[in-house]
Regions:
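Glycine-rich beta-strand-centered segment in the early N-terminal region that forms part
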Residues: 27-45, 57-98, 104
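Mid-domain Rossmann-like dinucleotide-binding core that forms the NAD(H)/NADP(H) cofactor-binding site
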Residues: 131-208
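NAD(P)H dinucleotide-binding glycine-rich loop of Rossmann-like/cofactor-binding domains
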Residues: 93-161
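C-terminal hydrophobic helical "lid"/dimerization subdomain
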Residues: 2-5, 285-338
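Glycine-rich phosphate-binding loop and adjacent beta-alpha segment
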Residues: 179, 234-303, 335-338
């Protein structure tokens, strides 16, 4: 291909407000040995992108600036130095450290190791491919239920926050794996109604009843076997009280706050297993195998990403603000212009 001298990208050179996401020109990357050059089409936004850019991540140090944001996206191969892919292949792009300790996907061209790419099924468009990765909810839910828990069909799952990636997508994974109940929550009646209209039957409207009352109503007073909590904050203690004896509580995020008050007897008397979740705890082979399985689910229609809104890449600051402050129902994406 004809060499490209410069590309458009979203880069921040200081930690701080949304406006630090700047639309800039950068030198174009090239594919080195073992790498693949991908023209990005649609990229996703993860709450972690905001955590890092705002300076609230452990790796948000001066040494990690400047940084191109973005942890995932969908694109097409335009050059390759790897036998694994050929020019014209449509690919998912994601990898460890993207957008945090290495420049990410919010740019026109990305040179990535072949191991960071996966083929996109031909009938999945770029937006839904990016939405599948954005927020990593499918991967989180699948790993919790297959690696943290010896999950069995007919067990029950609670994943609070139906509009977010972890809540919505963990519910879909739980259904696929045969859960008897896959429960989530909504902070408003409008969001609960949207969830019900989208086929999510067991959503607790927290503006009308407490989490505990809702879980007990849906489970006949029993509680749930597994909790996948990406919300945290004040919801944590109440959710823990809904766990069945011997159940597993996976702490995977803190969209609702980093501090929580819990009744320790809910852990002690129930012999509860409380697990912290980080992708760093899994071997690369485990992550790759999980993604391959999930792409199969996506291809067969067993999981279906929901898109809330698509912005142009140049509006990254507004796009991130929309995700963090508006808390939309579904994934927020950015389309990369040619």
């Amino acid at each position: 291909m004809k060499p490209i001298q410069s590309i458009k990208a979203i880069q921040y050179r200081a930690y701080g407000a949304y406006a630090e996401n700047r639309f800039v020109d950068l030198p174009a990357p090239v594919a080195n040995d073992g790498q693949v050059l991908v023209r990005m089409r649609t990229v996703g936004i993860n709450p972690l992108d905001n955590t890092f850019r705002s300076g609230h991540h452990y790796a948000a140090t001066p040494e990690n600036l400047p940084r191109v944001g973005g942890q995932m996206g969908a694109g097409v191969v335009v050059d390759t130095k790897s036998p694994s892919f050929k020019v014209g292949d449509r690919v998912f792009v994601t990898g460890p450290g993207f957008g945090v300790i290495a420049d990410g996907t919010w740019r026109e061209l990305v040179a990535a190791p072949a191991a960071s790419l996966m083929p996109i099924p031909s009938h999945i468009d770029d937006d839904h491919a990016a939405a599948f990765l954005a927020g990593a909810g499918y991967l989180v839910g699948y790993l919790v239920l297959t690696e943290f828990v010896a999950f069995k069909p007919a067990q029950s799952v609670l994943a609070p926050g139906i509009g977010g990636a972890v809540g919505m997508e963990s519910v879909q994974i739980a259904r696929k794996l045969g859960a008897s109940l896959a429960i989530s929550t909504a902070s408003t009646s409008a969001k609960a109604e949207k969830a019900h209209a989208g086929g999510y039957e067991h959503v607790i409207d927290l503006s009308r009843e407490s989490l505990r009352d809702g879980v007990m109503r849906l489970t006949g007073g029993k509680g749930v076997d597994v909790i996948i909590d990406g919300v945290g904050g004040k919801l944590t203690g109440e959710a823990l009280g809904c766990l069945l004896p011997g159940g597993t509580y996976a702490v995977v995020g803190y969209a609702g706050g980093r501090e929580a008050s819990v009744n320790l007897t809910d852990i002690i008397w129930k012999a509860a297993k409380v697990r912290g979740f980080t992708f760093r705890a899994f071997a690369p082979e485990t992550l790759a195998a999980a993604q391959k399985t999930l792409i199969g689910y996506l291809s067969e229609g067993a999981i279906q990403p929901t898109i809330a809104k698509v912005f142009p890449l140049s509006d990254a600051a507004d796009a991130v603000r929309h995700l963090i402050e508006e808390r939309p129902f579904g994934r927020v994406l950015m389309r990369v212009e040619d």
